[in-house]
């Protein structure tokens, strides 16, 4: 009589009958073996997923190094030249003079350099700094000067552009007074009082003669004169 073989338990049953199989499958040993059997496949699948994620992360880190996307984008244009990478500043733990080959992966603990915004004039990969028409040959704009600045006329080649004179400051106005009628004007805003001294005497005639003596003032009242007929 054939016997039944259990793959999970790796053993043969004594009898090949439905009742014996049901009794064996209900045992705690069989259930533990079934659980262990499927757990090994879950662990293998989980480990394979972890390895795949690590490979994808390493591939993205190598592709997105400092300046890599910008250089790849600029290389798509005809006649474009790859922009050189900025030097990496040494950390306190890195010895001085440590060689860093261009294109090599970054060391652990090293921060990637900060790239300037694309399109800065004068930087490799950005638009060139333009001078005004008529500028002498060999002239160079001052760092930070606006585009189009040029040196002074008659300056030797290679001189810096002329500096613009600062704008005059606006006049200082007194603070506005309150609009309440009858409010006293502060002393600082009131006009200064003008005191008039004795008026100057009128100038004499131009002939050089001495001026006429001043006449005595006439009294404001008069006396009645006696008539001659009474005498």
From Swiss-Prot:
Family as reported in the entry's similarity comment: Belongs to the U1 small nuclear ribonucleoprotein C family.
Protein name: U1 small nuclear ribonucleoprotein C-1
Zinc finger feature spans (Matrin-type): 4-36
Sequence ranges of Pro residues compositional bias: 117-127, 134-159, 167-178, 199-217
Subcellular location as annotated: Nucleus
Any GO BP annotation: mRNA 5'-splice site recognition
Positions of region (Disordered): 117-231
Compositionally skewed regions (Low complexity) per UniProt: 181-193
């Amino acid at each position: 009589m054939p016997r039944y073989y259990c793959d999970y338990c790796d053993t043969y049953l004594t009898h090949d009958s439905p009742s014996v199989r049901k009794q064996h499958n209900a045992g705690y040993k069989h259930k533990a073996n079934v659980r262990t059997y499927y757990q090994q496949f879950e662990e293998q699948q989980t480990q394979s997923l972890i390895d795949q994620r690590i490979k994808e992360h390493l591939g993205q880190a190598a592709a997105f190094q400092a300046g890599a996307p910008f250089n790849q984008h600029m290389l798509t244009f005809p006649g474009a030249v790859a922009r050189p990478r900025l030097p990496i500043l040494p950390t306190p733990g890195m010895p001085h003079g440590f060689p860093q080959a261009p294109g090599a992966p970054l060391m652990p603990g090293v921060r990637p350099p900060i790239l300037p915004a694309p399109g800065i004039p004068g930087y490799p990969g950005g638009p060139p700094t333009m001078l005004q028409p008529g500028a002498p040959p060999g002239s160079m704009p001052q760092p930070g000067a606006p585009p189009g600045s040029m040196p002074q006329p008659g300056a030797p080649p290679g001189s810096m552009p002329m500096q613009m004179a600062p704008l005059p400051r606006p006049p200082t106005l007194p603070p506005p007074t309150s609009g309440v009628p009858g409010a006293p004007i502060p002393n600082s805003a009131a006009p200064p009082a003008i005191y008039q001294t004795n008026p100057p005497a009128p100038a004499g005639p131009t002939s050089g003669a001495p001026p006429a003596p001043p006449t005595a003032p006439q009294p404001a009242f008069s006396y009645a004169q006696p008539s001659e007929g009474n005498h």
